[in-house]
Amino acid sequence: MGDAPSPEEKLHLITRNLQEVLGEEKLKEILKERELKIYWGTATTGKPHVAYFVPMSKIADFLKAGCEVTILFADLHAYLDNMKAPWELLELRVSYYENVIKAMLESIGVPLEKLKFIKGTDYQLSKEYTLDVYRLSSVVTQHDSKKAGAEVVKQVEHPLLSGLLYPGLQALDEEYLKVDAQFGGIDQRKIFTFAEKYLPALGYSKRVHLMNPMVPGLTGSKMSSSEEESKIDLLDRKEDVKKKLKKAFCEPGNVENNGVLSFIKHVLFPLKSEFVILRDEKWGGNKTYTAYVDLEKDFAAEVVHPGDLKNSVEVALNKLLDPIREKFNTPALKKLASAAYPDPSKQKPMAKGPAKNSEPEEVIPSRLDIRVGKIITVEKHPDADSLYVEKIDVGEAEPRTVVSGLVQFVPKEELQDRLVVVLCNLKPQKMRGVESQGMLLCASIEGINRQVEPLDPPAGSAPGEHVFVKGYEKGQPDEELKPKKKVFEKLQADFKISEECIAQWKQTNFMTKLGSISCKSLKGGNIS
């Protein structure tokens, strides 16, 4: 057996890959004297998803550093947070969480015997704890409590009192679990600073707080247990993983708001220390990255294509999920999963009258606001060699700013004054500091010698003319496509260039009133 790690080595293990540490000097002092006592809590709400591998990998680090680690299944918190977990399902949810999190830890080689597991209601309903809740409520302002839970507790128009209690209970957990530190996501920061402010008011000591970064969901927003579209469930089938990754936002050259790339950075690299891009030999073969920054650089330069990135993530992710799927492929755990998360369609309605908005939204091409545009100016992005910044006339009072990754594929002079096809109702987002107000649609052939061509409107088209799929010309486009609903991504999965170089959705042509949308030469290509 090797020598025990030094205090400095323990500090490195405890803090690596974290986004922020509050109380680092106190942490150093504790490590000089004894082992650190730390807890990680999770509210037992929606099904845990693949981003939970981020805290799992840190728990592995804590154990390597000799820490005494407690995992709290915060069932009472799950109920207090706008009843994300109904009272009658709390026990079942705790059991589900315990089984799935233990399976995750085993999947990455963490020894369970070194961990302590505890349920919130095992001590949060005691006389002493309840009295401290009242004591805390006598010194905490409504403003501070609401502010503390703003990024964690579900925000609604008429918030319940229970949501205001949530941060105080999480603060008290630090005292009642007798720990030196609490570990959580950066979204917990306001609760952590709340605890640092108010625990001393009750005569309790201020704890150390360790925060990991949040992994963006597949839509680019925070990955959430309670939002199905944003995440991959730990028990998703392989075909579901493929489907969700295929629809994930992963624009060529765009490293911002890229859920797929962020998952590699925050989950796969910390667990495996390397990542392999899987490619056919004719496209250059496999390439192994041992540093995330190198992968990000190649993706930004469009050396790595989104299709190869997604396929490689799919393979790596399924290797992590296979042991978890196998564990849950038993009658007892299948029954537990069904009982803890009953099918909503089989539940009795809670209120009289028909449910509003019960019909699923149609995902049809008419929801896209696609227009003919004319490029007025085109310049290199000041901070990204692979990006252009274009001013495009789309028939509005002022031209729109659009950022596109075409530098390596289309000379600047070919874009100047060119008629193009622009998706106009995406949510604006910053790309390397410049806000893009649309997407210039292009055909592409993937591979090591990737080819890209902007789509061409029919000759004689004018800026602002409506582009539609034949048969869907009458519909009203969404004012703004909501990223969480992934309308564009779902439709894009069926975009294709025909053998006649016509842009199509499900083999039906994209058109204007003057004819079909086309590209110059990329038969059988994709559209993005």
Swiss-Prot record:
Top EC category: ligase
Notes on how activity is controlled: Resveratrol strongly inhibits the tyrosine--tRNA ligase activity.
Disulfide-bond pairs as recorded: none
N6-acetyllysine, modified sites: K197, K206, K474, K482, K490
Sequence motif Nuclear localization signal, residues: 242-247
Binding site for trans-resveratrol: Y39, Q170, D173
Annotated phenotype, changing D308Y: Found in a patient with proximal-predominant motor neuropathy; likely pathogenic; loss of function
Residue sites binding L-tyrosine per the record: Y39, Y166, Q170, D173, Q188
GO cellular component, one term: nucleus
GO BP: apoptotic process; response to starvation; tyrosyl-tRNA aminoacylation
Catalytic reactions of this protein: tRNA(Tyr) + L-tyrosine + ATP = L-tyrosyl-tRNA(Tyr) + AMP + diphosphate + H(+)
Result, substituting P167T: In IMNEPD2; hypomorphic variant in yeast complementation assays; decreased homodimerization; does not affect localization to the cytoplasm
Keywords: Acetylation, Aminoacyl-tRNA synthetase, ATP-binding, Charcot-Marie-Tooth disease, Cytoplasm, Disease variant, Ligase, Neurodegeneration, Neuropathy, Nucleotide-binding, Nucleus, Phosphoprotein, Protein biosynthesis, RNA-binding, tRNA-binding
UniProt short sequence motif 'HIGH' region, positions renumbered to this chain: 44-52
Domain tRNA-binding: from-to ranges: 364-468
Enzyme Commission code(s) on record: 6.1.1.1
Modified residues (N-acetylglycine): G2
Localization annotation: Cytoplasm; Nucleus
UniProt entry tagged with the keyword tRNA processing: no
Motif mapping: 'KMSKS' region: 222-226
Primary localisation category: cytoplasm
Function: Tyrosine--tRNA ligase that catalyzes the attachment of tyrosine to tRNA(Tyr) in a two-step reaction: tyrosine is first activated by ATP to form Tyr-AMP and then transferred to the acceptor end of tRNA(Tyr). Also acts as a positive regulator of poly-ADP-ribosylation in the nucleus, independently of its tyrosine--tRNA ligase activity. Activity is switched upon resveratrol-binding: resveratrol strongly inhibits the tyrosine--tRNA ligase activity and promotes relocalization to the nucleus, where YARS1 specifically stimulates the poly-ADP-ribosyltransferase activity of PARP1.
PANTHER family found in the cross-reference section: TRNA-AMINOACYLATION COFACTOR ARC1 FAMILY MEMBER, TYROSINE--TRNA LIGASE, CYTOPLASMIC
Disease tied to this entry: Charcot-Marie-Tooth disease, dominant intermediate C: A form of Charcot-Marie-Tooth disease, a disorder of the peripheral nervous system, characterized by progressive weakness and atrophy, initially of the peroneal muscles and later of the distal muscles of the arms. The dominant intermediate type C is characterized by clinical and pathologic features intermediate between demyelinating and axonal peripheral neuropathies, and motor median nerve conduction velocities ranging from 25 to 45 m/sec. Neurologic, endocrine, and pancreatic disease, multisystem, infantile-onset 2: An autosomal recessive disorder with variable clinical manifestations and severity. Main features include cholestatic hepatitis, poor feeding, poor overall growth, and hypoglycemia apparent from infancy. Most patients have variable global developmental delay, sensorineural deafness, retinal abnormalities with visual defects, and hypotonia. Some patients have endocrine abnormalities. Brain imaging often shows dysmyelination, thin corpus callosum, cerebral atrophy, and white matter abnormalities.
Domains: entry comment: The nuclear localization signal, which mediates localization to the nucleus, is also important for interacting with tRNA(Tyr), suggesting that it is sterically blocked when tRNA(Tyr) is bound.
Descriptive protein name: Tyrosine--tRNA ligase, cytoplasmic
